[in-house]
Amino acid sequence: MNTKRRQFLATTGGGILGAGLLDSWSASVLGKTNERDGFLLSDEGCGRATGYAEANKIVTFGEQTHVAWLDSPADGFRVWVRTLNRATGLWSPAYMVGEGYDNHGGPALTVDSEGYLHIAYFPHHHAFRYRRSKRPNDASEWEEESSFGEKLTYPTLVCGPDNTLYFTARRSFKEKPWEVELWSKRPGQDWSRVGPILRSRYKGYAHFQESLAWGPDHKTLHLCCRFHENSDKEAYGRLQTVGYMKSEDFGKTWCRSDGGRIETPASVDEIDVLAQGGVDREIGLRAGCLAVDPKTGMPHLIYSIKENGRGRVIMAVSDGKGGWTRSDLSPQLPADLRGRDLIMPGGLSFSDSGQLHGAAQIQKAKEGESTWGNPSNESLRFVRDKDGDMWKISFASEPNSDRSQWLPNIERATGFNQIPDRPAIIYTSGGPGEKNTDLLSNRVYWAG
């Protein structure tokens, strides 16, 4: 379906706005959804339509919730946004923001104190593209596109108390170790490179999976990461490390959880280390997005460990003095799901009322099958009880053994967006494809 026809169908109530007719589990009819229903946002999603959980893709401001993802129609990769009016339950048409280079070009979305939306997207080892909405709390039109940086991939985006934007992305190089760069943008000014804050210890491919979250003071930036480094022809990621650091001055300087100063760009030798793995240790690690308790200011990290053929998810909570309390979520799976692998991607999110929520994947691949995009994948949501002892875990996706329902992205705080008592999750339904440039027709779902 071409872009113009897709916009027409969305506007007239056919196509993606009539999604409930395609999936009996969704109560969405002609673009209307109840808050807890599933809703088909698109049927042209790419292989990573909601991928890279560190990039926030859902923001609520007032009665509007805005959702961004990456499609792959016949004319190439495209970033789209739709808006849910929470008062009426009605969805807007899909509005195109811009292009993506390939399936890595998905967006990161935030909102400032005045309600203007900000979005970064496009690259896979290129400059990022950026736009601001023309009007507050309105995704239907965007200001002229601008670009910044070079050889960047994987965005994170948050908004500071004075509406300065803070952004990180991976920076690749030919002849030296890859890094994570921090950028900022003051209102009305161009993007400015602050500098590298993380660096691999090895030349060549690296991935950092970093996520950002504000402390309650809206000044302290907390960062969780998963270093993936030292790859060669024989092994993809010989060393993996889940780590943490924070900045108490808007990213100017960084320290460990105990306050010990870190010289940046930091390697895993300088930051808090929570878990170690990689091919050489026969342990696979993935990090989800972190969240910070709005009452205590303590960071909550989440990551998965794949070891001896089993996957489990760990939450780690800082005591602010260098210590971490870890808890395994896997034993709290419902009885009929135990025996499956609980894994990231996913993440954590505190609602404005202070309750902790999360998203994860569950899977059980058959022997010899690849776990990446495996049809056994389902997306889960979980919420911690008010006593802080138990988790209620349920499906975010409607179980479907024929389709991978994966890459969940949970709504979370980025500065000025409100987090409802039940944060939304979006996920991709369909396979990854064989190449980064494959144009697929995956479904993209909202789970409210």
Name every feature range the model reports, one short phrase each:
Residues M1-K4:
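N-terminal secretory signal peptides
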Residues Q7-S28:
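N-terminal export signals
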Residues T33-G448:
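Extracellular, repeat-based ectodomains that mediate carbohydrate processing or recognition
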